[in-house]
Amino acid sequence: MSRTTTVDGAPASDTDKQSISQPNQFIKRGTPQFMRVTLALFSAGLATFALLYCVQPILPVLSQEFGLTPANSSISLSISTAMLAIGLLFTGPLSDAIGRKPVMVTALLLASICTLLSTMMTSWHGILIMRALIGLSLSGVAAVGMTYLSEEIHPSFVAFSMGLYISGNSIGGMSGRLISGVFTDFFNWRIALAAIGCFALASALMFWKILPESRHFRPTSLRPKTLFINFRLHWRDRGLPLLFAEGFLLMGSFVTLFNYIGYRLMLSPWHVSQAVVGLLSLAYLTGTWSSPKAGTMTTRYGRGPVMLFSTGVMLFGLLMTLFSSLWLIFAGMLLFSAGFFAAHSVASSWIGPRAKRAKGQASSLYLFSYYLGSSIAGTLGGVFWHNYGWNGVGAFIALMLVIALLVGTRLHRRLHA
């Protein structure tokens, strides 16, 4: 007698057998399949953002070791997010053609290997090349994970599952910053990045093992004409271009604050250590709560109001960082992080329902704008820091958030007119 197994070769449970016999059934919350998807994508998000942002708290160290200005040092992060943004234009359509899981697994493995190789680079240009390859590789996870959830999870639970995925992103960003900051203080930055690379490699292997294969994936053509038609369709939508703008502004604000807050706090009167700068990433923990919470709140209040409220929380948190009290600054960072991850969770969960087809490409365009904001605003923030100090950086971030509120208001009115 043949033995029914799951996609990873493990014996299938009764629930798995039922799902296999009904291939069109969406995965619902509370089922073993939902737990596997949640754990797999949580670990993928964690590894992705640990790899991407591990250099952020050590920017002052890189400035000292390689004789760089803050703006030039920030390129080690900006080049990763820029290449990630460019890669999204290709990996989303690629996943539409060959499948979600193969693209994500390959991307995580390549990014982990490039991170380990970056610890062997002796020149700044060598480090930048590795960081560019890391960003390009991670583009295969960022948008495809969102698309996988929108395809495989029951529509009633997509916002909740997206919130859990984003919470994995927040923990990953926190872990990468925390490990690199503390390990750099006690050892050096090369050992710190090597530890993160090994951690991400283990996460990639676990992700490959437990993520179920796509059941609702239908391959589409990679012909340039088809890609252009879908691109035009997305940009003609009443809501998608505004969501793309939201991603640019939200991420640009978030990265700018965390890029330069460390420079500020290492100066007088605080003089905090590199380890403490890394510990500031604990502010990300609020994102692990606010992301799924925002997802559940959308069912009661709607996506527009929740996104606007979350953006307002970011603005209030930013204002608190303008004070000199270290406790007020950290409290402001907590609020800022909570608001960001909530707003991003809502915006990203809005993409799938709005896209009429080629959802992978739509998610890629959103995250292209998202990471483009990180690259452009993250580097421009260094100019404001150099010329105007933290007040200048705060004014720059506040301007982006006010524009985000205006865009969000227009989006809500347009889709509910």
Swiss-Prot record:
KW Transmembrane (keyword) present: yes
Membrane topology according to the record: Multi-pass membrane protein
Cell inner membrane in keyword set: yes
InterPro entries: MFS (IPR011701), MFS_dom (IPR020846), MFS_trans_sf (IPR036259), Sugar_transporter_CS (IPR005829)
Superkingdom in the source lineage: Bacteria
Main localization category: membrane
Periplasmic side: 1-38, 95-101, 147-152, 212-241, 286-315, 386-387
Ranges per topology, Cytoplasmic: 60-73, 123-125, 174-190, 263-264, 337-364, 409-417
Residue span of region Disordered: 1-22
Family indicated by similarity: Belongs to the major facilitator superfamily.
Keywords tagged on the record: Cell inner membrane, Cell membrane, Membrane, Transmembrane, Transmembrane helix, Transport
Protein name per UniProt: Inner membrane transport protein YnfM
One of the record's GO molecular function terms: transmembrane transporter activity
Transmembrane segments: 39-59, 74-94, 102-122, 126-146, 153-173, 191-211, 242-262, 265-285, 316-336, 365-385, 388-408
Species in which this protein is naturally found: Escherichia coli (strain K12)
GO cellular component, one term: plasma membrane
Localization: Cell inner membrane
